[in-house]
UniProtKB/Swiss-Prot annotation:
This is Lauric acid 10-hydroxylase. Mostly expressed in flowers and leaves and, at low levels, in roots and stems. InterPro entries: Cyt_P450, Cyt_P450_CS, Cyt_P450_E_grp-I, Cyt_P450_sf. It comes from Petunia hybrida (Petunia). Keywords: Endoplasmic reticulum, Heme, Iron, Lipid metabolism, Membrane, Metal-binding, Monooxygenase, Oxidoreductase, Transmembrane, Transmembrane helix. Its main location: endoplasmic reticulum. Gene3D superfamilies: Cytochrome P450 (1.10.630.10). Heme binds at residue 516. Pathway: Lipid metabolism; fatty acid metabolism. Its cofactor is heme. Its EC number is 1.14.14.-. It comes from the Eukaryota.
Amino acid sequence: MDYVNILLGLFFTWFLVNGLMSLRRRKISKKLPPGPFPLPIIGNLHLLGNHPHKSLAQLAKIHGPIMNLKLGQLITVVISSSVVAREVLQKQDLTFSNRFVPDVVHVRNHSDFSFVWLPVNSRWRTLRKIMNSSIFSGNKLDGNQHLRSKKVQELIDYCQKCAKNGEAVDIGRATFGTTLNLLSNTIFSKDLTNPFSDSAKEFKELVWNIMVEAWKTQFGGLLSFPLRKFDPQGIKRRMTNYFTKFLGLISGLIDERLKERNLRDNANIDVLDALLNISKRTQKRLTGIKSSSCLVSLFPTPFLPFIIICPFLYLLIFHRCKVSDLNGEGSYVGGRVQLNHTPLQIGCDRLTVSNKPRNYGDSYSSFRTCLQGLILHLNTLEWANGRTTSRIHTLLAKKHKKTISQHICTSKKIKIKKLLEHFLSFGAIVKKNLPIPPGGFSSSLFHVKWRKTLSCLGYIIPKDSQVLVSVWAIGRNSDLWENPLVFKPERFWESEIDIRGRDFELIPFGAGRRICPGLPLAIRMIPVALGSLLNSFNWKLYGGIAPKDLDMEEKFGITLAKAQPLLAIPTPL
């Protein structure tokens, strides 16, 4: 009898507690942002499909710019408006400063030493300071100009060799390898691989696989039930394998440096030396795994050039653009863009052609329009006929001739500050003259995490909810952009939009404390590499494929890229 009373008491207690918690959940749920009805266990995962960025944008049209989803059992708030993004990432920056850490990133304790995943604490500030002072500071980047020139020259030489042999260039592999070795020389003072060999392809695939596995757990790995501990999808197993390979490579380089520290001239200190020196000063040995994890965080960076350059070269071919030596402003002949070569210098970097430096044209306005106008979204671009080309040329002739001349100094070199502040952007690499709003090939979604329950635009957001800011949806918001999918560069001519996290219509690098530290490197490397490729060659698709028949399927992940490699045949100018 006593057992029966105990069981009844326990049941009554459970029923009471469960009822109170249910009432609390209902009260909270009424104050949550609107969203679709979740299914048991999986929540709203079934609504995401193969292209979550597109699915979320469509759902936002139904449920509004701030939307509540359940990914598995995790409450997820999706932001698809620049106004709400400003509230989250600027006005409440500290609250939203922590990343949502995917479960698989904890393998090999990587999340404990990576400035990408660490919460905002003293360790994160130290690592961020090292990155900013040793890699991404203006003085450091300007001092490495010779290294960028060397790596771009190697890229041009490789394309020249392919042109001579009539071979196609895998643009993604070539630009990845070039930037990989630029980064590895900055960190380790040596090349990691031959940028045009199969080893570069393997390294690229290794880095990409790490990014993909980390991204999968944001959606498919969120099912909160016991089987998750057994890794039924094999994500943890694969990630452990990838990290073991990557950390083994980096750890080997660290051990090699430790052995040669006493013999090596440290006049030109690199990033690894900076880490080791900090370790020595603090009397704490920076173990191999910690150093490796810090450095592994940097290696998604080489994907940025090929994500940007591949689509632009495709669109260059698609619109039959051509760079030629002409006098005057430049013109459009037979649907082709033709430019002259008045000197242009992007900061310390000069564009390269063949085996010598080559300055670019005074009608950089035309090149700028191609660069910024064609670089972005492949799927919805609507600029394909000669009438549109003629219209753009007419607008350029009226609008940009005066603008360009204002920024050319007496030496006929365009100054970096004026050039970049008035023309270039990166991520959706365009700052002012974006023909299509951001997000085409930049990070389509990024994740932050609430530290406490708080209010946002009248809604209650529970503590530890996941927050997704949909850059892709913001960039295609018809309330924000008139005809957002139409090629219309003139929409930005009078715009003051900036990419440094102040204007939330364009945040390809994020905003607030967690804004990407690689922006200074990006705005130096991408224009020079891309400009040199265009300044040296004409390009056509491999295999006689018509541009309209090219497979333009997207590869969804932390960044958006072409699923199939872009193969193009260069022809020297």
